[in-house]
Design a protein with these regions (language model features):
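Short alpha-helix in the alpha/beta-hydrolase fold that links the catalytic acid
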Residues: 177, 186, 200-209
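Flexible "cap/lid" loop of the alpha/beta hydrolase fold
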Residues: 101-109, 113-145
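Short beta-strand/loop motif that positions the catalytic acidic residue
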Residues: 183-184, 190-192, 196
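Catalytic histidine neighborhood in serine/cysteine hydrolases
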Residues: 208-225
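Conserved HGGG/HGGXW glycine-rich cap/lid loop of the alpha/beta-hydrolase fold
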Residues: 11-62
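Conserved acidic catalytic loop of the alpha/beta-hydrolase fold
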Residues: 73-91
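Hydrophobic, aromatic-rich cap/lid helix
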Residues: 150-179
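Catalytic histidine-centered segment of alpha/beta-hydrolase-like enzymes
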Residues: 222-235
Length: 238
């Protein structure tokens, strides 16, 4: 897995790349506050079959920051601009958490960009669309994640900053991905960790059934970041 930089408008966007340059492109998209670092184990599993690209969206990880925190729609636009700058007109995309909302927003508006989608732990479950509802679930899931992931998240959150985190989270909580699902024609796999405290199985089933070509797979015993804790199992689903 190697670092890769691309200029997108006024910003430099950092990504990690792996796999043969002539293999089909697969983009891995991170969640709220974190960089693509926690996608690296999965990228390594996928690299023999795919050209894997793991961007840090603007303001996340090592990428330059936009002047202000981007909304879900703004992040989707940033993803589209990065895909264009990379010369990637059509890709398979796997996203986690907030990244699923970004992917859904872009795929609903520009469906021709996506061959296939994999949504891992898609947010936001309508029952928990407030900071008060989400905070306890964050801590419950945190105790189910490995310590190695906690270290990655701590570094990424410190870099992202509390004000940008709050603004981005506010946009995510106000987003309604369920209203966009019917406009996504790409085959889409919804993946949920069986011990994911962030999103319920009922919500993930609603996402899968709301998609014209959706399917739900539950990976038993795994938390929200199932792609990190069970990369080989998730890679086998892609």
């Amino acid at each position: 897995v190697k670092p890769h930089w691309t200029t997108v408008g006024p910003l430099r966007v950092h990504a990690r790349v792996a796999g043969p340059p002539d293999a089909p492109p697969l983009v891995l998209l991170h969640g709220l506050g974190v960089s693509g670092t926690y996608m690296v184990p999965l990228a390594r599993e996928l690299a023999p079959r795919w050209r894997v690209l793991v961007p840090d969206l603007p303001g996340f990880g090592r990428s330059d920051s936009a002047p202000r925190a981007l909304s879900v729609r703004g992040l989707a636009g940033a993803l589209a601009a990065w895909l264009d700058a990379e010369g990637l007109p059509r890709v398979t995309l796997l996203a986690n958490s907030l990244g699923c909302q970004v992917a859904i927003d872009l795929a609903a508006r520009e469906p021709e960009r996506f061959e296939r989608l994999v949504l891992v732990g898609p947010t936001v479950d309508p029952r928990y669309r407030s900071f008060a509802a989400h905070t306890p679930r964050f801590f419950v899931d945190a105790f189910r994640e490995p310590l190695s992931l906690a270290g990655i998240i701590a570094v990424d959150y410190a870099r992202f900053g509390p004000f940008r985190f709050a603004a981005t989270a506010r946009s995510a909580l106000g987003d309604r991905p369920e209203d966009k699902l019917a406009r996504i024609p790409a085959p889409t796999l919804v993946v949920k960790g069986g011990h994911d405290a962030f999103v319920s199985t009922a919500w993930c089933d609603r996402v899968a059934t709301g998609l014209p070509r959706g399917e739900l797979v539950v990976v038993p015993g795994e938390p929200h970041a199932v792609h990190y804790t069970a990369p080989a199992r998730v890679a086998a689903l892609v």
